From Swiss-Prot:
PTM comment text: Shedding, cleavage of the extracellular domain to release a soluble form, is enhanced by a number of factors such as heparanase, growth factor receptor action for example by thrombin or EGF. Physiological events such as stress or wound healing can activate the shedding. PMA-mediated shedding is inhibited by TIMP3.
Keyword DNA-binding attached: no
Lineage: Eukaryota, Metazoa, Chordata, Craniata, Vertebrata
Glycosylation sites: S43, S65, S67
Database matches in SMART domains: 4.1m
Region called Disordered, residue ranges: 41-75, 87-112
Subcellular compartments: Membrane; Secreted
Protein name (record): Syndecan-4
């Protein structure tokens, strides 16, 4: 007669095998798209889009979609032929006809159409025009403390450092005061107390 533990182990193994077999059958199950239209599936029981295919379609039929580098399947009737009408390509731009279509030819009209920049040219004034261009490495390397972000970071870092030092000193003072009050037992008391050796005679 088998022990109850052995029977329980055997039932557990058989149940696990049946669950694994049922799951593998479910994964390879082919779903007909007509079943979806007839409403045989409930709202949360729909299969994945990858599982739904036309009748007779294998997963290999779908591998030809993508970049188009490879030639497609031999069935040419699946791909419709598109014919584009031939359009002559030239770069001829038609002339505009109308009030704004005339190009000015007289010098006075050309001067009126000129766009004059509003800023002064550096060559117009008495300013000393220098051809020296400051490199980024030399311009920033002159003094790092002239930059506002570096200066603000140093100030904030200094304030945080001072606050940390103040809190550290306050913690040390607090601990020293606690030691002075006697809250810590600094003296060692003997663990074993010697019994009195006085003898009484009657």
């Amino acid at each position: 007669m088998a022990s109850p533990r052995l029977l329980a182990l055997l039932l557990l193994l058989v149940g696990a095998f049946n669950a694994a077999a049922a799951e593998s059958i479910r994964e390879t199950e082919v779903i007909n798209p007509q079943d979806l239209l007839e409403g045989r599936y409930f709202s949360g029981d729909l299969p994945d889009d990858e599982d739904v295919g036309g009748p007779g379609q294998e997963p290999d039929d779908f591998e030809w979609s993508g970049s188009g580098d490879l030639e497609g399947p031999e069935d040419k009737h699946m791909l419709p032929e598109v014919t584009h009408p031939l359009v002559p390509l030239d770069n001829h731009i038609p002339e505009r006809t109308g009030p704004g279509g005339r190009v000015p030819t007289e010098p006075k009209e050309l001067e009126e159409n000129e766009v004059i920049p509003k800023r002064m040219s550096p060559f117009d004034g008495d300013e000393d025009v220098s051809n020296k261009v400051s490199m980024s490495s030399t311009a920033q390397g002159s003094n790092i403390f002239e930059r506002t972000e570096v200066l603000s970071a140093l100030i904030v870092g200094g304030i945080v450092g001072i606050l940390f030092a103040v809190f550290l000193v306050l913690l040390l003072v607090y601990r020293m005061k606690k030691k002075d009050e006697g809250s810590y037992d600094l003296g060692k008391k003997p663990i074993y107390k010697k019994a009195p050796t006085n003898e009484f005679y009657a």
